[in-house]
Amino acid sequence: MAAYTCTSRPPISIRSEMRIASSPTGSFSTRQMFSVLPESSGLRTRVSLSSLSKNSRVSRLRRGVICEAQDTATGIPVVNDSTWDSLVLKADEPVFVDFWAPWCGPCKMIDPIVNELAQKYAGQFKFYKLNTDESPATPGQYGVRSIPTIMIFVNGEKKDTIIGAVSKDTLATSINKFL
């Protein structure tokens, strides 16, 4: 088995010298071998946070995004596994619970609708958001399999469930059933 040494640098970032084991005799051109590959500096699979903060475009975009602190952005209080009983099941008013996750696109789509309804029905309904990533026990207990899922509770009992990104009219109709 003959070993050939490639001494010319290929157009992609590979070591300048590499040994290729081959059984046929003869030579080949590294330019011909790599000419079918696109010009590239390789893939970066990891990005450091420090490099992101140095990029002004990325840091500008990052400042306007609020995922984990969605309750701060929306004004709707958060409920979790530990506060579920006291805030939802023992509530005096009907309760509207939005089961969501920060990565969920449809959850982001209905968020402005839920905020608008929370303002409209303030004093008649209590509105809460439950992050299913941070509090997985409660969604499991109530059979939440997809998000967004909206549940309405009256006197601690689940009365209605709406699954998916639905219209404002659909949500308002469900709320009006329990006023």
From Swiss-Prot:
<keyword id="KW-1015">Disulfide bond</keyword>
<keyword id="KW-0150">Chloroplast</keyword>
<dbReference type="GO" id="GO:0043085">
    <property type="term" value="P:positive regulation of catalytic activity"/>
</dbReference>
<dbReference type="GO" id="GO:0009941">
    <property type="term" value="C:chloroplast envelope"/>
</dbReference>
<keyword id="KW-0809">Transit peptide</keyword>
<dbReference type="GO" id="GO:0010319">
    <property type="term" value="C:stromule"/>
</dbReference>
<dbReference type="Pfam" id="PF00085">
    <property type="entry name" value="Thioredoxin"/>
</dbReference>
<feature type="site" description="Contributes to redox potential value">
    <location>
        <position position="106"/>
    </location>
</feature>
<dbReference type="InterPro" id="IPR036249">
    <property type="entry name" value="Thioredoxin-like_sf"/>
</dbReference>
<dbReference type="InterPro" id="IPR017937">
    <property type="entry name" value="Thioredoxin_CS"/>
</dbReference>
<dbReference type="GO" id="GO:0048046">
    <property type="term" value="C:apoplast"/>
</dbReference>
<dbReference type="GO" id="GO:0008047">
    <property type="term" value="F:enzyme activator activity"/>
</dbReference>
<protein>
    <recommendedName>
        <fullName>Thioredoxin M1, chloroplastic</fullName>
    </recommendedName>
</protein>
<feature type="active site" description="Nucleophile">
    <location>
        <position position="104"/>
    </location>
</feature>
<comment type="similarity">
    <text>Belongs to the thioredoxin family. Plant M-type subfamily.</text>
</comment>
<dbReference type="InterPro" id="IPR005746">
    <property type="entry name" value="Thioredoxin"/>
</dbReference>
<keyword id="KW-0934">Plastid</keyword>
<keyword id="KW-0676">Redox-active center</keyword>
<feature type="disulfide bond" description="Redox-active">
    <location>
        <begin position="104"/>
        <end position="107"/>
    </location>
</feature>
<dbReference type="GO" id="GO:0009579">
    <property type="term" value="C:thylakoid"/>
</dbReference>
<dbReference type="GO" id="GO:1901149">
    <property type="term" value="F:salicylic acid binding"/>
</dbReference>
<dbReference type="GO" id="GO:0043086">
    <property type="term" value="P:negative regulation of catalytic activity"/>
</dbReference>
<keyword id="KW-0813">Transport</keyword>
<feature type="site" description="Contributes to redox potential value">
    <location>
        <position position="105"/>
    </location>
</feature>
<keyword id="KW-0249">Electron transport</keyword>
<feature type="domain" description="Thioredoxin">
    <location>
        <begin position="67"/>
        <end position="179"/>
    </location>
</feature>
<dbReference type="GO" id="GO:0009507">
    <property type="term" value="C:chloroplast"/>
</dbReference>
<dbReference type="GO" id="GO:0004857">
    <property type="term" value="F:enzyme inhibitor activity"/>
</dbReference>
<dbReference type="GO" id="GO:0005576">
    <property type="term" value="C:extracellular region"/>
</dbReference>
<feature type="active site" description="Nucleophile">
    <location>
        <position position="107"/>
    </location>
</feature>
<dbReference type="GO" id="GO:0006109">
    <property type="term" value="P:regulation of carbohydrate metabolic process"/>
</dbReference>
<comment type="function">
    <text>Thiol-disulfide oxidoreductase involved in the redox regulation of enzymes of both reductive pentose phosphate pathway (Calvin-Benson cycle) and oxidative pentose phosphate pathway. Under reducing conditions, activates the glyceraldehyde-3-phosphate dehydrogenase and the phosphoribulokinase, and inhibits. the glucose-6-phosphate dehydrogenase. Activates NADP-malate dehydrogenase.</text>
</comment>
<dbReference type="InterPro" id="IPR013766">
    <property type="entry name" value="Thioredoxin_domain"/>
</dbReference>
<dbReference type="GO" id="GO:0009570">
    <property type="term" value="C:chloroplast stroma"/>
</dbReference>
<dbReference type="GO" id="GO:0009409">
    <property type="term" value="P:response to cold"/>
</dbReference>
<feature type="transit peptide" description="Chloroplast">
    <location>
        <begin position="1"/>
        <end position="48"/>
    </location>
</feature>
<dbReference type="GO" id="GO:0015035">
    <property type="term" value="F:protein-disulfide reductase activity"/>
</dbReference>
<feature type="site" description="Deprotonates C-terminal active site Cys">
    <location>
        <position position="98"/>
    </location>
</feature>
